[in-house]
Every structure is written in C-alpha cells, then in structure tokens.
Amino acid sequence: MFRTAISGLVCTTFLVLLGFPAVPQEPADKGAATESGQQTFNNACRTCHTTKEGDNRLGPNLHNIIGRKAGSLQSYGYSSAMKGADFVWDKEKLDRFIAKPDEIVPGNNMKPYGGLASAEDRAKVIAFLESPTTN
C-alpha cells in the first residue's frame, strides 16, 4: 500500500511539473517571426540603418525607435524636416512612414527610398524593431 501511494504521488508530481515548466516558454513561431522580420529589415533598411545603439550609418540607428521622438538622436544629423517633425514614433506612425516616408515627413533625407509597399513586410520590420533582441 505504501508503495502504491508513493508511486501515485510521484506520477502526480511528474504530471504537475509537465504542466508548469520552470522557464516561461515563448511560442515557437515568435523566434521565426523575429528572424523573418530581421531578414526583411536587412533587405529593406540595413543599407542605411542599424538597430545597434549609437551605430549611425547613412540613417540614424533604430535602437528603441518606438517611443522615441522623431529626429531626436543627438548623435545623428537629421534633415531640418525630420528635426521639425512633432511626433513620437509608435507602430502606426512607423508603418505609415515605412510605406510612404514623404507623406509623413516631407523633405526627409531618405531618397532614393520610396517606401515598402507590402503591409506584411512592414509589419515584420516593425515586429523586429520592437523585439527584445533589438532593444
């Protein structure tokens, strides 16, 4: 009888532990989505931008872009149009800007970039920019 009780307790404990992993698990597709977003970022943005803090290229670094006031990095020489832009980057504004930068900030210095037409690709880039690996 003692053996049966111990055996039942061990099985119950094992089943409980299976249901409650010690480390929070990320959905399997989240890593794939970030990787896909990084690939899209690399194809559409990386020529001029990086996500490394302080590493400006032709364009400013996009580290922690969401929540940042437009044209506000002290270490980058923005166009007067971007310096004068009176908004804070959020996902919606970033989506519209990536699609048609001249409509959001006329006079920006992003020529010859004309925008990223695919809403799916823009969403991938934005998800990548807000991911913990880039912030």
What role is predicted for each listed range?
Residues T34, Q38, T50-K91, P112-Y113:
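Gly/Gly-Pro-rich "capping" loops immediately C-terminal to redox-active cysteine motifs
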Residues G8-L18:
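Bacterial N-terminal signal peptides
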Residues M1-T4:
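Positively charged n-region of N-terminal signal peptides that target proteins for export
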Residues P21, N43, R68, K100, ...:
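Residues within well-ordered alpha-helical secondary structure of globular protein domains
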Residues F20-N42, L58:
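Electrostatic cytochrome c docking/interface patches
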Residues D90-N135:
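C-terminal capping alpha-helices of c-type cytochrome domains
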Residues N42-T51, V125:
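The canonical Cys-X-X-Cys-His
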